[in-house]
From Swiss-Prot:
GO terms for biological process: arginine catabolic process to glutamate; arginine catabolic process to succinate. This is N-succinylarginine dihydrolase. Pathway: Amino-acid degradation; L-arginine degradation via AST pathway; L-glutamate and succinate from L-arginine: step 2/5. One of its GO terms (molecular function) is N-succinylarginine dihydrolase activity. It comes from Pseudomonas paraeruginosa (strain DSM 24068 / PA7) (Pseudomonas aeruginosa (strain PA7)).
Length: 448
């Protein structure tokens, strides 16, 4: 049966700013307090969506969160009208206002973990919103994420939605940024690959010393159970703690997989040979031929991988059977990385083409092409059941660019977050967006 991988990219929200909120994310920390350009950021993301759509890939849109989140601020003791809440927070606790104004939901690889129907016990596509409990500014996302996903995938015959895991450190879950899937064809049963940074309950697993490991083994196992995955179709691997301490805060900063191919750095995992052997064996039993492309540290150091976001790329299957690697401009600007990519595409391997995108606004906050998208493999009848308002078309692209032009600012600094007018601008924009994308009422300000 025909099936497609659809990339649902996060639409950058109107409060996109450089708050430096993500400890362990080198780019986020190093660009803290710089002036951002929300309008440019949103258009850069939309340009990538349009370009991939025009290349023949299925492309969708995931709406941003409503920010500033005044409900979160109220839960922290700020009272009065929404405007007074913002004013008080700006005066008394600016870091909290910055956190509650973050546009980090643009990185939809962290929105949820998705298992296609070919892998699940009940034959439906399963979604579990990520609790993102390692960072306060992201931990407040999942209630809205769940409502948005339910509005996009709203046919219970085809789609099952699970609430986020318990919001405690033992079940820290960062979603699809630590998950990929291997398969012969998108509609076939595949092998789901869960990567964790530490175990909450088993001290035999090592842990990083400098930066936190955001994903636990126990969270991965819980999601696999919720989705009804069989043991024959799951592989768990531990990310190398040493690379977490070098700024690899999610596995999609050090590896990317698609189809039968895993593109990874030599230092990405612990027990690499054992992990690759299990993937090879389990995918082979499901009719596939697993292939790993290992990037040696002598050719690309971990530091270069983090700076360029070589692995935070999209690996896409083309109609001719070859693969396209979508990378940020920073890869072309790094001589060692670019030399490697030129050699890679010159080999007789599956990755034959590299396409470069300017995503500087997102990159400066620590998110590349892979961060910006949530992959959902859908059979034809499942794709037909998706809310059509969120599927990218030439017309929707034009509508969204015009919407951005009407509502977004072209510069935003920390002081601007204290402007109560920003809240009204954002709510007006998002109220209109839910009509454009045919989502109904998904934001708290629409439900109150």
């Amino acid at each position: 049966m025909n099936a497609h991988e659809v990339n649902f990219d996060g639409l950058v929200g109107p409060t996109h700013n450089y708050g430096g909120l993500s400890y362990g994310n080198v780019a986020s920390q190093s660009n803290s307090q710089a002036l951002s350009n929300p309008k440019e950021a949103a258009k850069q993301g939309l340009a990538k969506m349009k370009a991939l759509m025009e290349l023949g890939f299925k492309q969708g849109v995931l709406a941003p969160q409503a920010r500033p989140d005044t409900a979160a601020l109220r839960s922290l003791g700020f009272s009065g009208s929404d405007e007074e809440v913002i004013r008080r927070a700006a005066k008394e606790a600016m870091p909290l206002l910055a956190a509650c104004s973050s546009a980090s939901s643009m990185w939809t690889a962290n929105a949820a973990t998705v298992s296609p129907s070919a892998d699940t016990a009940d034959g439906r596509v399963h979604f579990t919103a990520a609790n993102l409990n390692c960072k306060f500014h992201r931990s407040i996302e999942h209630p809205t994420t769940s409502r948005v996903l339910a509005a996009m995938f709203n046919d219970e015959r085809h789609f099952a939605h699970h609430a986020a895991l318990p919001a405690v450190s033992q079940f820290g879950d960062e979603g699809a940024a630590n998950h990929t899937r291997f398969c012969k064809d998108y509609g076939d049963a595949g092998v789901e690959f869960f990567v964790f940074g530490r175990s909450a309950f088993d001290s035999r697993f090592p842990a990083p010393q400098r930066y936190p490991a955001r994903q636990t083994l126990e969270a991965c196992q819980a999601v696999a159970r919720l989705h009804g995955l069989s043991e024959a179709g799951v592989v768990y691997a531990q990310q190398n703690p040493a690379v977490i301490d070098q700024g690899v805060f999610h596995n999609d900063v050090i590896s990317v997989g698609n189809g039968e191919v895993l593109f990874h750095h030599e230092d990405a995992f612990l027990d690499t040979e054992k992990v690759l052997a299990e993937l090879h064996d389990k995918l082979g039993r499901r009719g596939g031929r697993f292939r790993a492309i290992c990037v040696p540290r002598e050719q690309v150091a971990v530091e270069d991988a983090v700076k360029s976001y070589l692995f935070n790329s999209q690996l896409l299957s083309k109609a001719d059977g070859s693969m396209l690697l979508v990378v940020p401009e920073e890869c072309r600007n790094n001589p060692r990385v670019w030399n490697y990519l030129e050699r890679l595409t010159g080999d007789d391997g599956p990755i034959r083409e590299v396409k470069v995108f300017d995503l500087k606004q997102s990159m400066q906050n620590g998110g590349g092409p892979a961060c910006l998208r949530l992959r959902v493999a859908l059979k034809e009848q499942e794709l037909a059941a998706v809310n059509p308002g969120v599927i990218m078309t030439a017309g929707l692209y034009d509508t969204l660019v015009a919407w951005v032009d009407r509502h977004y600012r072209d510069r935003l600094g920390e002081a601007d977050l204290a402007d109560p007018q920003l809240l009204q601008e954002c709510r007006t924009a998002l109220d209109e967006l839910t009509q454009i994308l045919k989502l109904g009422s998904v934001y708290s300000f629409q439900l109150d």
